[in-house]
Amino acid sequence: MLLSVEQVTKSYGDRVLLDGVSFYLERGDKVGIIGVNGAGKSTLLRLLAGAEEPDGGTVRLDPGVRMEYLPQNPVFQGERTVLEQVLLGLNDADRSLAEYEARTILNRLGVSRFEQSVGNLSGGERRRVALAAVLARPCDVLILDEPTNHLDNDMVLWLEDYLRAWKGALVMVTHDRYFLERIVGRMAEVEDGRLFTYEGNYDKYLERKAARLESERASERKRQAILRREYQWVMQGPTARGTKSRERLERYEALKAQSGPAEKSTLELNARASRLGKKTIECTGVTKGFGGRTVVRDFDCMLLRDDRIGIVGANGSGKS
């Protein structure tokens, strides 16, 4: 086992994000971490990577295991060049092996000016340089927080192929369902402070989570039925003198104290404004540029009610 987590808890102020979470990682495992926004996914990754300490429990990395971690917001210190940043901290032997790989990966991620200072990079370029760094360095475990951020479609497809072929262990958070579907073999969902694991990819996760929720609902229906029956008995005013009556009263109180399945957080988008007709946005001949560079020219578009349109294109082409 490369990495093990036992009964880990983590809180920020009065808010408990992780409560008694356990997790393991074997060689070759590829795990996707999912959950609603704010559930604690990135917190879990930081604990796995050693970037934060748990409030309780243990996180254990086997001796000699090398790990690389991509945070959501990488921070670069100093004025190193792009290539220096990617190879930072490597010994001579690892550096010579990693440099060719680093140049190849940077090119695939759209970063070709290796001698440029990292201080002059845009936010998207910094993310791609940080991603190249964790991919190029020799390691046994990759921990990636939103690795597809700031990647165009071709870059995402390349990264997908790269991670599918990679032989090490992988833990990642991503909101890209299809990326998860094609790469991971185990899903772990952070929910209400707990971690639920499911063998299989995203589609298998959906099936198995539905089965788990139905089992929870069935258990709750059974609990409610027993409570109703026991309530009727309690209302008859039994005495607690006898051992059996006392034990039954204790079981009733314990059953009543249990909580049923919590309401699950959901994302709900609700357009409240009324609209007349089907047309919502119309653009005619729109042109936009920055500093002499035209990114949109003579753009025509009509957006109708209920349209669903995806905007794709290379980085810097003008999508945003």
Segments predicted by a language model, with ranges:
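Intracellular alpha-helical coupling/juxtamembrane segments of multi-pass membrane proteins
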Residues: 208-251, 255-262
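ABC ATP-binding cassette signature C-motif
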Residues: 1-221, 265, 269-320
